[in-house]
Amino acid sequence: MIVCIAEKPSVAKDIARIIGATTARDGYMEGNGYQVTWTFGHLCELKEPDDYTPMWKHWSLAALPMIPQRFGIKLINDEGIKKQFATIEKLMQAADSIINCGDAGQEGELIQRWVMQKAQAKCPVKRLWISSMTDEAIKQGFQELKDQGEYQSLYLAGLSRAIGDWILGMNATRLYTLKYGQNKQVLSIGRVQTPTLALIVNRQKEIDNFVSEPYWVLATIYRDTQFTATSGKFTSKEEGEKAFSTIAGKPFTVTDVSKKKGNEAPPHLYDLTSLQVDCNKKFAYSADITLKLIQSLYEKKYTTYPRVDTQFLTDDIYPKCPQILNGVSQAKIMSQQKYLPLIQQLATISKKLPKSKKVFDNSKVTDHHAIIPTGVPPTGLTDMEANVYDLIAKRFISVFYPDCKFSTTTVLGEVINEDGPKPEKIEFKVSGKEILEPGWRVVYAKDVKNADDDDASDNANGNADSGNGAKKEVVEERTLPSFTKGESGDHQPTLTEKWTTPPKYYTEATLLRAMETAGKFVEDEELRAALKENGIGRPSSRAGIIETLFKRHYIRRQRKNLMATPTGIELIDTIHEELLKSCELTGIWEKKLRDIEHKTYDPADFINGLKEQINKIVIDVLSDNSNRRVTIMTEEDLKKKPAAKKPAARKASAKKMPAKKKDEATAQNVDTQNAAAQPVSAPQAPADPMVGKPCPLCGKGVIIKGKTAYGCSNWKSGCQYRQPFSQML
């Protein structure tokens, strides 16, 4: 008998139907020589400290660091899990061979390997490796089963990650809780969660300590077109006024007119992070909600495997693309067959689909390709699922359209004052961008913003006035009047006072990008791709990391902004060990885990390195003779509304402002403080407006209210919708 083990019952039932195992048994399906069983995600976990020795049961500084001689696994203590494992164990011990049908990724490999180890399976094991759950993909996967040994390095990377997280998390959490905690509250420390928290805290401090400074911009209007001085901003009013007086009353002369044609390629296909970023920007979906939505679309066979970190396809997908587009053309989203005209128009542009290296590149794909539609026309989608599918479908269609062709016109001018002993000249510039052929942009013509507009306008490091570094110039799409070199005439100069502004608070979108690039803020897609190697966390785990920070009350959401709580700020201030809070160092560890997966780094070296680091951290913390304590915030604390007070840094900036600006700044400070002090959830009304609404995730159940979060009445059937009260601002 061949035993197949899937990661969840719904996947097992699909596989069983395809291979003919149609007889339902207790905990598995049977038929046609197969027995198809399943896990519920993780059935096993690494042992707890007290499973190794009773000395580690009670938290004690003297027992640190805790490092087992050999790490072991155990069943999760749950009656349902124990019952299902007993079924799996019985099937595996009698099996002639096993097919690992787990999720095709690092975590999926680890989940199934641990179950097989715990069940003491001795027979040969094959691996089903597929990128979508369509019937065709499952059938092809069973025809092309791999030897499990081909994925040994993937398993070792997952195992090293789990052990590394145990060593750092277990030891550092006990260490910091015992040394700096109070009131028996746990201070949770994690290899990825703590550097992520540090990003949010450091950004918040930059904002709190920011002192707004005035500057002046010189511009002039010539022929109803505003030109800006190329010399940049003036940091003193006197300098600006001097420049203004230099050009006042003097003629403006056009010195150069240049036109340059350019092409704008379609945006890359989606990986998980870029999809989460766009869903947060466009729909305000959290990273966790987006992951659940795309997972649901995958399990319904409408999109391909979601937990990916590549934006490319392999060459073998190209012949399937016409069929996929045909399926997408039949899709009805919100009762509209919106993709059919776009795909029909694509057929008029070229008889054969173009094949670009920017889309198809085997060297950029390891386990799975970018997220694309499967070609199965979706039905019965919730509004939230439809929004996510719409992004993926449009992105897939757009990559087969031609580049957008545009023309950029740059006009240079100058004003010369010859009244003094030495002529003074001030130069000006204006640029305009004209779309010649929209190309792929027609796919997004009805959208409020084009696909890449958000990336161009949203700089994670602040805005153009922040003074934090140069930004890539964004040329406004406008058609300039026809100018001729040498023409001259009157103009109207202006000197405008502006104020530098602080960096922006993180949103989930900008935080995900920062995690992806280990805290380095880049706009260029190619550079961003290179930095992914040193990103912190995996695409599939980043949403969970952010949710953990919410659950620990280290951060909270204020509209779309992520704000650190006093507990989160104090915890980061208390941690002096860079390994625990440095994105760069954590990113290096993350790269080593990828190297293990690629067979270029020894897992033993990774574990030994972490052991050395935790030893050093324990010694350093125990040597701290201060009496520092971290304030622990509870749910009730977050609901309290303390009196608003202005940060010192804001006062400093207000002092430099004129009366009107000062009033605005004061009002802004009060609003910010009041907003930060708002309760996490509003006082309960007699009838909660959320309760009873259709579930936005599965569409089958209705929203119910629990102790700490809203959920779905269909949770017993597997719906994972959960919206904590602390995120309902």
Model-predicted segments: where are they?
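Metal- or metallocofactor-binding catalytic centers and their adjacent structured scaffolds
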Residues: 237-270, 276
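Conserved short loop/turn motifs at secondary-structure junctions
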Residues: 1, 99-104, 183-186, 259-268, ...
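Phosphate-interacting basic helix/loop segments used at nucleotide- and nucleic-acid interfaces
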Residues: 71-98, 199-200, 278-279, 391-397, ...
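Active-site phosphate-binding and catalytic loops of NTP-dependent enzymes
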Residues: 23-28, 148-153, 174-178, 205-210, ...
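Basic, low-complexity terminal or inter-domain segments flanking catalytic cores
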Residues: 2-3, 118, 287-288, 309-729
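C-terminal or mid-to-C-terminal helical accessory/interaction module adjacent to the motor/catalytic core
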Residues: 80, 93, 135-216, 220-222, ...
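Intrinsically disordered, low-complexity regulatory segments
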Residues: 1-166, 170, 448-449, 471
